[in-house]
Swiss-Prot record:
Residues 194-207 have a biased composition (Acidic residues). It comes from Mus musculus (Mouse). CDD domains: W2_eIF5. It is found in: Cytoplasm. It comes from the Eukaryota. Component of the 43S pre-initiation complex (43S PIC), which binds to the mRNA cap-proximal region, scans mRNA 5'-untranslated region, and locates the initiation codon. In this complex, acts as a GTPase-activating protein, by promoting GTP hydrolysis by eIF2G (EIF2S3). During scanning, interacts with both EIF1 (via its C-terminal domain (CTD)) and EIF1A (via its NTD). This interaction with EIF1A contributes to the maintenance of EIF1 within the open 43S PIC. When start codon is recognized, EIF5, via its NTD, induces eIF2G (EIF2S3) to hydrolyze the GTP. It holds the Pfam family W2. Residues 231-390 form the W2 domain. One of its GO terms (biological process) is ribosome assembly. InterPro entries: ARM-type_fold (IPR016024), IF2/IF5 (IPR045196), Transl_init_fac_IF2/IF5_dom (IPR002735), Transl_init_fac_IF2/IF5_N (IPR016189), Transl_init_fac_IF2/IF5_Zn-bd (IPR016190), W2_domain (IPR003307). The keyword Mitochondrion does not apply. This is Eukaryotic translation initiation factor 5.
Length: 429
């Protein structure tokens, strides 16, 4: 699950996202440590080396840190909860990632070890400034500058501007002329010629460049759409699924779209609520016929999924509410059709019948629907009792009596009676 990079922004459509931190505690006793499993992904979203936030945790917690770059293992000694580290990460983002002006995380760090300064530039608003180097992490950053923040970054830009300025003043530079040597205090980039030949989309207006830009933008937009859909609320995702199913029906291809519909529901992470959408789109007053027609569609959602079956029952209530006059008396038959089609299990139906909910229809209608369903519910319970009773009888029939030769025989003692008349003479019998 992803969260906003700037968690003070509650907008769900905020474009800057990062994965939620995952922490795993390993070891025991003095060797206990917390491995931040997805630190590489988090750091990538922040445009910072993964060692920076890990070291920041160590500075804030007063704990030692370990970096295994080859195996992507970033460790903080001690046992620490993921939520605690996530809150602590907000402090790192505020100090070392967000722009002080626009509060967007589109910043780059520019480290100058000689001057012991860390510059900060924002690509969103153009802000340029210096970071406060009093934090302990700054010492680590000065010793380990980010790869994209070499000292010559600003100088490269200056050299590029100088070259462009000279081109404007002197026209195009001829190949026979030797370019002027760089100033003694600056180091010319080793691939300056290659940099000049890089594509600059801001200046290239050819049809090929425009087409290439549009292709990349469209591909990127598709990826954003897929990820953005999962960031929406459940209600919004259900509405997307509803529009998808409705479109299939309007196009006349709903009968063969059962696999596509369940795949879309899984993509939107609302598979259990699929039957609720299907009932609204596919069912009307002819529901008994439609259950048979669209059985395969519902079975893909309801098979061995009790939650989906409950949503199917709630969907049925909604259909009855829309066609109450035609369907209210047919409730037992409709439930029997769904039961026979293996869309509903006994346990789910009985549980649903025991409590009326006003979440989808009025409380009065929910109660009335359950009253009308009583004959079928009663039949279900009786059938269940009969089946359980039959099983007990079968068990009794299958019991095998085993006689033991070593079993002890109880000893019978004769009791003498005081009444002599009651004595029986065995010889006289």
């Amino acid at each position: 699950m992803s969260v906003n990079v700037n968690r003070s922004v509650s907008d769900q459509f905020y474009r800057y996202k990062m994965p939620r931190l995952i922490a795993k505690v390993e070891g025991k006793g003095n060797g206990i440590k917390t491995v931040i499993v997805n630190m590489v992904d988090v750091a990538k979203a922040l445009n910072r080396p993964p060692t920076y936030p890990t070291k920041y945790f160590g500075c804030e917690l007063g704990a030692q840190t370990q970096f295994d770059v080859k195996n992507d293992r970033y460790i903080v000694n001690g046992s620490h909860e993921a939520n605690k580290l996530q809150d602590m990460l907000d402090g790192f983002i505020k100090k070392f990632v967000l722009c002080p002006e626009c509060e967007n995380p589109e910043t780059d760090l520019h480290v100058n070890p000689k001057k012991q300064t860390i510059g900060n530039s924002c690509k969103a608003c153009g802000y340029r400034g210096m970071l406060d180097t009093h934090h302990k992490l700054c010492t680590f950053i000065l010793k380990n500058p980010p790869e994209n923040s070499d000292i010559g970054t600003g100088k490269k830009e200056k050299e590029k501007k100088n070259r462009k300025g000279k081109d404007k003043e002197n026209g195009s530079v001829s190949t026979s002329e030797t370019p002027p040597p760089p100033p003694p205090n600056e180091i010319s980039p080793p691939h300056a010629v290659e940099e000049e030949e890089d594509d600059d989309w801001g200046e290239d207006t050819t049809e090929e460049a425009q087409r290439r830009r549009m292709d990349e933008i469209s591909d990127h937009a598709k990826g954003l759409t897929l990820s953005d859909d999962l960031e929406r609320t459940v209600e919004e995702r259900v509405n997307i699924l509803f529009d998808f199913v409705k479109k299939k029906k309007e196009e006349g291809i709903i009968d063969s779209s059962d696999k596509e519909i369940v795949a879309e529901a899984e993509r939107l992470d609302v598979k259990a609520m699929g039957p609720l959408v299907l009932t609204e789109v596919l069912f009307d007053e002819k529901i008994r016929e439609q259950i048979k027609k669209y059985r395969r569609h519902f079975l893909r959602f309801c098979h061995n999924n009790k939650k989906a079956q409950r949503y199917l029952l709630h969907g049925l209530e909604c259909v009855v509410a829309m066609h109450q006059a035609q369907l209210i008396s047919k409730i037992p038959h409709i439930l029997k059709e769904m039961y026979d089609a293996d869309l509903l299990e006994e346990e789910v139906i009985i549980s649903w019948s025991e409590k009326a909910s006003k979440k989808y229809v009025s409380k009065e209608l929910a109660k009335e629907i359950r009253v009308k369903a009583e004959p079928f519910i009663k039949w279900l319970k009786e059938a269940e009792e009969e089946s359980s009773g039959g099983e007990e009888e079968d068990e009794d029939e299958n019991i095998e009596v085993v006689y033991s030769k070593t079993a002890s025989v109880p000893k019978v003692e004769t009791v003498k009676s005081d009444n002599k008349d009651d004595d029986i003479d065995i010889d006289a019998i």
